[in-house]
Curated annotation (Swiss-Prot):
Belongs to the bacterial ribosomal protein bL36 family. The gene is rpmJ1. GO terms for molecular function: structural constituent of ribosome. This is Large ribosomal subunit protein bL36A. SUPFAM superfamilies: Ribosomal protein L36. Pfam families: Ribosomal_L36. GO terms for biological process: translation. It comes from the Bacteria. GO terms for cellular component: ribonucleoprotein complex; ribosome. Keywords: Ribonucleoprotein, Ribosomal protein.
């Protein structure tokens, strides 16, 4: 999982989902699990 300032590029990748957990924003991608990130 990467920690990024901006998730804008990651959320455009096919299969990406934006999830809010415990006040943090995550991008999870079941199609391409390498594209996981958290907004730092």
């Amino acid at each position: 999982m990467k920690v990024r300032n901006s998730l804008r590029a990651l959320k455009k990748i096919p299969g990406a989902q934006i999830v809010r957990r415990r006040g943090r924003t995550f991008v999870i991608n079941k199609n391409n699990p390498r594209m996981k990130a958290r907004q730092g």
